[in-house]
A protein has these predicted regions:
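Conserved N-terminal phosphate-binding loop of PLP-dependent enzymes in the Aspartate aminotransferase
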Residues: 1-168
Length: 168
């Protein structure tokens, strides 16, 4: 297991309220305990801390991590079924609700299917699903839905992606 020395978090941890955090090991934190007082205008702001705590409470009480894990697995299984049906899907990977499906013109050469993925992204948008491209070759279909995304939503995404890929 790898334990990071420093973790920087931001954006979603305040659920719309501007909030960021830097979490460090005790050893690194002790380096700041040198007699000089560290000052930050917004550091430890009570409103921000309350917002962050509320977000953590909701994540825990509503079992959002478990939901993301279960819904993500459901979605990945559906994408893998599509991978068995469509050779254009060269790989499916991810964790929770952060998933990628790599589109290739050939599984042997792994040539990126960039024009095809652009069509898929636009047609998914037309059908009400916001997905995008990622990866150094821009051929990975990035699926990163909000936490409220359900298994029913995932099933609809798979059904629509199946229809689009059938038409390519």
């Amino acid at each position: 297991d790898v334990v990071p020395d420093i973790v920087v978090m931001g954006k979603p941890i305040g659920n719309g309220h501007p909030l960021a955090a830097v979490v460090v090991t005790n050893e690194i934190a002790e380096a700041f305990n040198n007699g000089l007082e560290y000052f930050n205008t917004f550091g430890g702001n009570p409103v921000s801390m309350a917002a962050g705590l509320a977000v953590l409470d909701v994540i825990e009480t509503e079992k959002m991590q478990q939901h993301a894990f279960e819904t993500g697995n459901y979605l990945m299984n559906g994408l893998r079924m599509l991978m068995n049906k469509f050779p254009i899907i060269g790989d499916v990977r991810g964790y929770g609700l952060f998933i990628g499906a790599e589109l290739v013109r050939s599984r042997e050469t792994l040539e990126p299917a960039v024009p095809e993925i652009d069509i898929v992204v636009e047609q998914m948008k037309d059908r009400g699903f916001l997905v995008s491209t990622d990866g150094p070759l821009h051929n990975v279909l990035k699926i990163k839905p909000p936490m409220v995304f359900s298994k029913e939503n995932a099933a609809a995404l798979i059904t629509n992606l199946d229809a689009i890929l059938s038409e390519l």
